[in-house]
Regions:
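Helical mechanochemical/support elements of P-loop NTPase systems and associated helical scaffolds
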Residues: 22, 48, 61, 72, ...
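Hydrophobic aliphatic residues
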Residues: 43-47, 100, 163, 189
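Active-site glycine-centered loops adjacent to acidic/histidine catalytic or metal-binding residues
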Residues: 75, 142, 175
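Canonical P-loop GTPase G-domain recognition
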Residues: 3-15, 146-195
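Conserved C-terminal guanine-recognition region of P-loop GTPase G domains, centered on the G4
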Residues: 94-169
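Residue-level signal for inorganic ion chemistry
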Residues: 65, 142, 185
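Conserved G1/Walker A P-loop phosphate-binding module
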Residues: 1-83, 194
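Flexible beta-alpha connector loops of hexameric P-loop NTPases
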Residues: 79-89, 116, 145-148
Length: 195
C-alpha cells in the first residue's frame, strides 16, 4: 500500500455523512492533546497532513483520510477538554455512540493514551466503546519520549490495568516525536485493513 497516496476526503458532523464505499475504516480516538493528528502524520511520514490543532479540542468533526484508495484513517474528535461547553460534550457523546453503533463504519480501532499518565475516566469510557463494539483495536501509549526508561514498564502496566484491557488487546508504546512504535502500529493497521 502506498502511504504517500493519501488524501483528506471529508469532515462530517453526522454518521449519515460517513463514506459508504465499503473501504476499511481505521478509527483513531483519544483525548484532546494526546497527539492523534501527530500520530497519523508520523504513520504517513507527512509533517502536516492531519492538521495539528493549536488548541485542544480543535477536531470536533470526524475527519476521513483515504489511503491509496484502499482504506480510511478516521480521526475521531478528541474528548475530555475542560473548556468545551456541555452542549458540545453531549454532541460528541451522541456522535461517538452513532459511529460505534453503525455496523458499516469501524473496521479497527486505534485508541491513544498519554504514556506519562494514568488513563482518565473519559479514556475508560472510550476503551469501553471499543470493547463493546466487538471490533478489534490496539491501545497506543503516545509521548513515550517524555518518559525515563525506568518509567516505561510500570506506566504501561498501569494503563492496561486502568483500562481493564484483555490480554488480546495489544498495547504499543509510541513516540510521534521520535517514531518509536511506528513500524509495529503500521503493521497492525495494514493487517487489519486486509482482513
Amino acid at each position: 500500500m502506498n502511504l504517500h497516496n493519501a488524501e483528506f476526503v471529508r469532515s462530517v458532523a453526522s454518521v449519515a455523512d460517513c463514506p459508504k464505499d465499503g473501504l476499511p475504516q481505521i478509527a483513531f480516538a483519544g483525548k484532546s492533546n494526546v497527539g492523534k493528528s501527530s500520530v497519523i502524520n508520523k504513520l504517513l511520514l507527512r509533517k502536516n497532513f492531519a492538521r495539528v490543532g493549536e488548541a485542544p479540542g480543535k477536531t470536533t468533526h470526524i475527519n476521513f483520510f483515504r489511503i491509496d484508495e484502499a482504506m480510511y484513517l478516521v480521526d475521531l474528535p478528541g474528548y475530555g477538554y475542560a473548556k468545551v461547553p456541555q452542549k458540545e460534550k453531549e454532541r460528541w457523546g451522541r456522535l461517538m455512540e452513532a459511529y460505534f453503533a453503525a455496523s458499516d463504519t469501524l473496521t479497527f480501532g486505534v485508541m491513544l493514551v498519554d504514556a506519562r499518565h494514568a488513563p482518565t475516566a473519559n479514556d475508560v469510557v472510550m476503551a469501553n466503546y471499543f470493547l463493546q463494539s466487538g471490533k478489534p483495536f490496539v491501545v497506543v501509549a503516545n509521548k513515550l519520549d517524555k518518559l525515563k526508561k525506568s518509567e516505561i514498564e510500570p506506566n504501561l502496566a498501569r494503563i492496561r490495568e486502568v483500562l481493564s484491557l484483555p490480554e488480546a488487546v495489544r498495547l504499543i508504546p509510541f513516540s510521534a516525536e521520535k517514531g518509536d512504535g511506528r513500524d509495529e502500529l503500521l503493521t497492525v493497521i495494514l493487517h487489519a485493513a486486509e482482513q
